[in-house]
């Protein structure tokens, strides 16, 4: 058995019936020592830990409570939470089995208050609770209830400490772990730590905090729980407090404690960075952990943590890992924040926190917020940031180039500046190709384009027209047409395009031929410069704008990605050509742009002149963006450069910085989009066309090219998120891992009672008994299992008079506990067996109890020589055992005949309650009363039958049965209801004595 003395467990009522003989069940064996507690198990990720709460379950183990003490520290836990490690020990709490009791731990919730839990500190142990996480182990989970404690969990916050928590593992003791739940909380707060985590990895620690939380709590929990609980230990609560301590933890968590460090960052975890907490881990040993709880106080700081928010996610992530850092726990002090931890309660929830470990991250999680670290996390976003970089590609966005028309928007481009980066875009040069054009559209961003500005070149914008076209380029499609590039020429103007709008003029695209300029188109990106578009005047040509449709091609913009090209912007100088952009007006032809394919013209042909087309600016849809990129060739439009004057516009170029976006610059390639020139038609935007002059910029447009990307640049903003990147750290969280051993499962609960035994099958009719051989000594009864709850007993049947004993019928034995020794006495003839009463309902099976010791056997009456056993009749199904009727007087026992074959075992009926035992047969034949039966545990699963005792030596043989055949079975007395194990009905009349039965097997 679990080694537990279950006596404390309520025993189900034993109907027991006479059973009597049964012999007292021996005392249960001593309970085995509780198994070792399981390994605390690594702290769960803390973060989650909050979840941990669940760990609480483990609380059960708690009983060992141990926990209690365990809990104690909690406070420290603060960081030490780590120490939580020791928590492991908490594990033992496992035993706590009781821990279950820990359930009460729920009160742990109270733990909330637990904050005070600080005390909980001890809860700390709980930290170990963290481990409580382990609480997982908690399977006992129930204790988990305790998790409630977990509420205390809030304390959990301390959890951050929890980080330390990890150590919390120890928390494992988690049962405490129960507390663990608290830990949950912990995690949350811990989360902050998570912040830490951020760096946290530490943060992650937080996670540990998780556990911390847990732990924290855990401590509590578990501890308490079971801790104590003793089982009951209950302790409850765990002392919940301990957990509470957790609370303290909360504090810790409190934020962060993590943040604790960060303190404010708290959450932010940012600090999380503090991840340093990393160190956290170390503390783990702290095991003290619990202590930490107090730190938790610090937790106050935690509040600061909020800011941590920022980390929010970030932290979390990280931290989680950190959890281990839990050590950081110290920061845990911050835990003081613990209060915040309170929130931890929720941590309870954390139960799951188990994972809570994760919680570490959870920590943040706790913060859920990402809380704290998470905040940081955002930064992680930033990581994204980089992403934005990609956006650059968005350069493709260049597509927007079409927008380019909006080119004007370009101004916005300024932001593009940021794009500066875009320059890099320059590299985008290549972007120049078409994408640019798109960009052109981008242009607006074009402003960025201006970026192109960088391009100043923006002016190239004219080509920008191109750009327009570029946009068109977008049209790029055209671009595809790229060829359209021809118009692309316009494209050049395209840049202006941005003003492009004029891209429509891309129509001019017709001019497209200028397309060559289109080449310039690339500049188009600068198109954004297009803003320059002012010159839009040229826009008139914008008329061509219609062609803008072509702009669709802008599609091309895609190419924009190349934005990298953005660099290109330099080229923007070319913008001069932008003038050509005017041509853009020409753009009208832009429609022609479709021909874009002519893109080949790509020369870019000086056609820049086409710039005028810019006016067409209308922008074709350009949106397409498209392909145009290819049109890139249009770039030639350069000639359009004349427009360059507008180049001045180029100033806009300044925007160029936007260029950063320029990266998108690559979009610049959109310039190719120039072909989009058709967009030229967009030229109208062309007015912007004037921009055409900017077209000049166009050349610069080239740079502009970049510009377009610039817009992408806009995208840049996302960059910020990049910060989130930090989050990445989070990774550590892992630490949590330790969840610690699962803590031992607590010792097994007391064994359940043995379930009731099914009624025994009715015995087959016994053949006439042969002369009884000497009765072998009964084997020692096996230890009875604890009785399971027993079903209601059936009423006892009235015992029939005992008929003469027939041979004993051999029914399949019900599983029965060992029988008590049979008292001596001759068996009277068996009365009829009483009818079996209806079977009692089976009680729920109790835990299998340990087998009780067999009762002492009563003295064995001398058995008559066994007659041959009659054949055993088939076993009837077990009927419900009726209550046994009174036993009739037993007739003299005939010699036992040889034992007949056993009948088939009847189905076991439900075990009825044992009926009262009928009176025994008269002495002489009467069988001695059985010794008192030990309580029959309800039969759980039947215990194994003890080996039969050796059969005593055979008594003198009675006269041989006639032939040893089974005598007729005596009438079977009514079967008494089978009590737990009803006594065996009297034997039927003896058959002719058979030869002595063989000695019983031992």
Swiss-Prot record:
Alphabetized UniProt keyword annotations: Extinct organism protein, Extracellular matrix, Glycoprotein, Hydroxylation, Pyrrolidone carboxylic acid, Secreted
Annotated tissue distribution: Expressed in bones.
Biased composition (Pro residues): 987-1002
Protein name: Collagen alpha-2(I) chain
Function as written in the Swiss-Prot or TrEMBL entry: Type I collagen is a member of group I collagen (fibrillar forming collagen).
Organism taxonomic ancestry: Eukaryota, Metazoa, Chordata, Craniata, Vertebrata
Subcellular location: Secreted; Secreted, Extracellular space; Secreted, Extracellular space, Extracellular matrix
Organism in which the protein naturally occurs: Glossotherium robustum
Protein family: Belongs to the fibrillar collagen family.
Pfam family, one: Collagen
Residue list for modification 4-hydroxyproline: 10, 13, 28, 34, 352, 355
Biased composition (Low complexity): 17-60, 145-166, 211-232, 276-286, 330-346, 381-400, 505-522, 534-544, 577-621, 628-648, 666-676, 697-706, 760-787, 795-805, 853-898
Region (Disordered), start-end ranges: 1-1002
